[in-house]
Amino acid sequence: MDGDRGKRDSYWSTSPSGSTTKLASGWERSSKVDTWLLILSFTQWALSIATVIICIIISARQGYSTKEYSMTVEALNMSSREVKESLTSLIRQEVIARAVNIQSSVQTGIPVLLNKNSRDVIQMIDKSCSRQELTQLCESTIAVHHAEGIAPLEPHSFWRCPVGEPYLSSDPKISLLLGPSLLSGSTTISGCVRLPSLSIGEAIYAYSSNLITQGCADIGKSYQVLQLGYISLNSDMFPDLNPVVSHTYDINDNRKSCSVVATGTRGYQLCSMPTVDERTDYSSDGIEDLVLDVLDLKGSTKSHRYRNSEVDLDHPFSALYPSVGNGIATEGSLIFLGYGGLTTPLQGDTKCRTQGCQQVSQDTCNEALKITWLGGKQVVNVIIRVNDYLSERPKIRVTTIPITQNYLGAEGRLLKLGDRVYIYTRSSGWHSQLQIGVLDVSHPLTINWTPHEALSRPGNKECNWYNTCPKECISGVYTDAYPLSPDAANVATVTLYANTSRVNPTIMYSNTTNIINMLRIKDVQLEVAYTTISSCITHFGKGYCFHIIEINQKSLNTLQPMLFKTSIPKLCKAES
């Protein structure tokens, strides 16, 4: 303790400039005051004794009268008072000087030192957090997290019952849950918000959307807005998306087709930066630039731009885009789904169906991957792996999903739930039914698709809701689904419940053969765009889904994503 006191006194006796400041400790000040008071008391006692002795001597030896004696005593008392006042004044001046010194130090010196020390600590932490190996430790100090009990829905733990078997119930009918929506929008009447992408991580979520200031053409200059936030519970105990930080990327960069990942306390988005329209891109060799954006909860952002020569491609591509839907984080890498056109087509037999179809063969299916409207390029899906994503310059590697495992390449998303990776791809070709399955990301890439007969999407006349026979077409809409059971047989989705038109958005809970429970958002005439998202969570085992739909604001002729929420109608069937 004495050693600590010595260090402390030594520390506070030094000003920020390094000069010595003479500050007495509390103990030293108390000792000095006690010493002065002792001296004063002793002096008064000595004077009193001396006065009495002098008076006695004077009276005895000289026989002074009583009057003269009184005058002498009075003179001595006055002298004593003068000495007392002088000593008191001296002590008071010393104490006041010390008090002023202490007050100055408390009001000025100490705060300056504390501020300096605080800055030193902050700089030390920031410097440490810039080191890759300490990134996760530093991120964990930021106190932003989903509400207690909230986590991404994991099918293996959700699709079970304490007693009996789980199933989707048709009764009661699902309804929309109350709560606010804080999705980014436009500040202009003619502005158009497109291509929403949502990733729900263990701690935070990331949401991205594209804002075109005039009209909805994909090639128009646009802002990209990336939000990070957490999921809370409102007063009705329903989950809400609460944005914490948002960043708007330069309109002149024209980011398009962005996919997001939320992991740790950061959001990542991978975008294309096209300088030409889609058809022109497919007709030329090489891909448009890609950009990886990083945003953290402090609002700090970093971007990495990659040209064709800087991307490790397993085959030459004429066009390549992130798939709009979210990606995943796994084993030190970010993995995004992508799609694009190969410069030279791959050989092999793609997914096909010939039963019940006239004049159809495997060659029909193979040729259907080559889209005339896109310069006859073979359109495939790819895995875009961002390795060392915490480093100063992450590396991008692209691996093509074999055509033997896939349908026509298109937009889609990946979900890592438990130990499985689920894949959804938009039904852009002749295969109109929902395309969802389990993806093995090891080598070679394989997909175990779950056949769905009940769910489909609107398309053009040749490839409408009911089409199941192979032919060349490019149509459909992005209406992803979230797996509720491990085999992806039970899903939550938003479907445009129409044959050929993008109308009638309907929230559906379905198995492979039947639509079990559904809710029409408004009416069959409500127009939408081609992106609907469903992402689900649990709150202490209770399931909820967020649905984001691009609604056509008909009176303004613009598109705006809107957020809806439902409770999952899962029940447990009692054993007989």
UniProtKB/Swiss-Prot annotation:
GO terms for cellular component: host cell plasma membrane; membrane; viral envelope; virion membrane. Attaches the virus to sialic acid-containing cell receptors and thereby initiating infection. Binding of HN protein to the receptor induces a conformational change that allows the F protein to trigger virion/cell membranes fusion. Neuraminidase activity ensures the efficient spread of the virus by dissociating the mature virions from the neuraminic acid containing glycoproteins. N-glycosylated; glycans consist of a mixture of high mannose-type oligosaccharides and of complex-type oligosaccharides. Residues 59-140 are annotated as: Involved in interaction with F protein. The C-terminus (head domain) is involved in binding the cellular receptor. Keywords: Disulfide bond, Glycoprotein, Hemagglutinin, Host cell membrane, Host membrane, Host-virus interaction, Hydrolase, Membrane, Signal-anchor, Transmembrane, Transmembrane helix, Viral attachment to host cell, Viral envelope protein, Virion, Virus entry into host cell. Disulfide bonds join 192-216, 258-271, 357-469, 463-473, 536-545. It comes from the Viruses. It is a single-pass type II membrane protein. Belongs to the paramyxoviruses hemagglutinin-neuraminidase family. Residues 1-24 are annotated as: Disordered. The lineage of its organism: Viruses, Riboviria, Orthornavirae, Negarnaviricota, Haploviricotina. InterPro entries: Hemagglutn-neuramid, Hemagglutn/HN, Sialidase_sf. The keyword Transmembrane applies. One of its GO terms (biological process) is symbiont entry into host cell. This is Hemagglutinin-neuraminidase. Glycans are attached at residues 77, 499, 511. Gene3D superfamilies: 2.120.10.10. Its main location: virion.
